[in-house]
Structures are given as C-alpha cells and as structure tokens.
Amino acid sequence: MTVLEDIVAGVREDLATREAATPLAVVKEQALARAGAKSAVDVLRREDAIAVIAEVKRSSPSKGALADIADPAGLAADYEAGGASVVSVLTEQRRFGGSLADLDAVRAAVDVPVLRKDFVVSPYQVWEARAHGADLVLLIVAALEQTVLTSLVERVHSLGMTALVEAHDVGEAHRAIDAGARVLGINARNLHTLEVDRATFAEVVGVVPDGVVKVAESGVRGPHDVLEYARAGADAVLVGESLVTQGNPRGAVADLVAAGAHPALRAVRH
C-alpha cells in the first residue's frame, strides 16, 4: 500500500464515522444556510504579484510533527496580516493532525478565502467543506478516478466554491484540465518517495492553458523559491512547513509576499 493509499483508507474510515453521526441531508442544510463562498480565482491571479496561500499545518507524513498549533485562528490572523491571499487549513486528522474545528476557527478569524485541504473522495466532504465555511476545496488527481474527479469538481463549483485540483505530473495535469479545473496546483512532492523536486513545476506548467490559475505547491523555503516559481510561470505559491516551523509567521508571510511583488518579476508577468 502506498502512502497515498494508506491515507485515503484512513480518510474513508473517518468519513464513515462522520456520515453516521451527521447525515448528508443535515450537512446540506448547514451548507446552504451559509453565506456565499468568497471568490478565489481573482485573488490568486493578480497582475502585479504572486499570491501566497499560507497553511495551518501541524504535521505531515514526510516530517512528522511540525508545530504545536494551539491557536489556529491566531496563526491564520497572522497570515492574513502578513499579506496572505488565501489561508489553507489541513482537516485530515491521522497524518496531518488537522480537524474541521480548525477550519471553523480559521474561517471565523479571517476575511480572505479559506481552503479546505484534505483527501476528498466523496461529495459528502464537499458539502461538509461549505458547511464549515470553506471557499476552496483541494481535489487530488492521484486519489480519484476520472469520473469521480470530474463529478467532484462540478459539485465544488456548483456550491460556489473553487476546486484547487492537484497534479504531480503532466498526465495528471491533463486529467485536471479535462475535469474542468480552473485552479491547478502543481505539487513538487513525489507521492511515493515524499521527496521534493522543484523542477516538477516547470516540467508540468507548459501543458496548462493560460486561463487556468497555476499554483506551485511544496518546496517553498523562502523568498528565493517564490521568485523561482514565479519565473517558471506560477500565479501563486502554497506554503506550509516553512511558515509553522519558525517563530514569526506574520513576518515570514510578508517576506514571501514581498518577493512575489518584486519589480524583477514584472516583465515575467506581462
């Protein structure tokens, strides 16, 4: 069993428990009672700068425990104050230490769009994301059959949210586009080895249509990586580990945002 398969198996078990406790009909009522989702495409595709998606992330399969985040709302507020365009919240519990309670806390704390980052395999989780205030939902191509991926993209968009569809290679990028992705995440982390190769972004981005927002995921350790991804064609970067493992997340986000707005990138962006 691969790392991804193991994670998804656990996700399905936890999902079954939640479905038994809260039927889909109830979750749908909660979702439809929410105010409309915030638009994410425009904040991720800016003419003047690279957008930063800052992540609330306690642990990961590759590194184990990263940070003891006692106050996810406070961390998210720091991210927003530092200039983050979107806040990402891990809600997978077993490997990443996240929860829907974290999503609730972050949603209440910030005005920027919020991404639910999880291993979504069922429409229930999409409705659940909206019920808890998410504006974007991560969908991982490698975890989904094409018909399921397409159906989930359509469901996310039908609820006014934005699907961030994640690919790891050219083939997955084509699948994401065929499924209707408007925002494509290109993850530099190999799902089998968990190693990061930032060259993956440059290899994949060439097949992505101009109208699709391109998000570079994994491997952002500092401002120089933002510049590298921007020069390769990224519209946004998603950053987690490097923000939660040092003492000044607000300042760290501000540094990444400043790099994304560097004058040297203007010629690249136009």
Curated annotation (Swiss-Prot):
PROSITE patterns given in the database record: IGPS
Domain of life: Bacteria
Biological or metabolic pathway of the protein: Amino-acid biosynthesis; L-tryptophan biosynthesis; L-tryptophan from chorismate: step 4/5
Single GO MF annotation: phosphoribosylanthranilate isomerase activity
EC number: 4.1.1.48
Reactions it catalyzes: 1-(2-carboxyphenylamino)-1-deoxy-D-ribulose 5-phosphate + H(+) = (1S,2R)-1-C-(indol-3-yl)glycerol 3-phosphate + CO2 + H2O
GO biological process, one term: L-tryptophan biosynthetic process
PANTHER family, A to Z: INDOLE-3-GLYCEROL-PHOSPHATE SYNTHASE, TRYPTOPHAN BIOSYNTHESIS PROTEIN
Official protein name in the record: Indole-3-glycerol phosphate synthase
Primary gene name: trpC
